[in-house]
């Protein structure tokens, strides 16, 4: 059972997924801090409120925080889209060459020999 788990864990797809999760978590922290500490204060200054995210609420519904989460999501989605587009262009899938069956090769050789006579 341990051997099967080792084979599963060391497959390329599982390792790629694990790396993607760790990188995604780290990237999410960067984007969250960008939105929280740079973008939202700028939006707050534009609308005349120092803390846009926390000050904007209506009947206890903090829609400022919701807007901040939406901006956070949009930035992550755009960055991931760009990353995937770049990765897809770098890793082009090679089209498999058409394999000719052995029978076809032999028949072609026989045909060529008969034509030569």
UniProtKB/Swiss-Prot annotation:
Domain of life: Bacteria
A Pfam family: MscL
Cellular component aspect of the GO annotation: plasma membrane
Main location: membrane
Chain segments annotated as transmembrane: 7-27, 30-50, 64-84
Keywords for the protein's UniProt record, in alphabetical order: Cell membrane, Ion channel, Ion transport, Membrane, Transmembrane, Transmembrane helix, Transport
InterPro entries per record: Mechanosensitive_channel_CS, MS_channel, MSC/AndL, MscL_channel
Any one GO molecular function term: mechanosensitive monoatomic ion channel activity
PROSITE patterns, per database record: MSCL
Topology versus the membrane: Multi-pass membrane protein
SUPFAM superfamilies: Gated mechanosensitive channel
Compartments, as annotated in UniProt: Cell membrane
Subunit-structure text: Homopentamer.
Family per record: Belongs to the MscL family.
The protein's role, per its UniProt record: Channel that opens in response to stretch forces in the membrane lipid bilayer. May participate in the regulation of osmotic pressure changes within the cell.
Protein name: Large-conductance mechanosensitive channel
Native source organism of the sequence: Staphylococcus haemolyticus (strain JCSC1435)
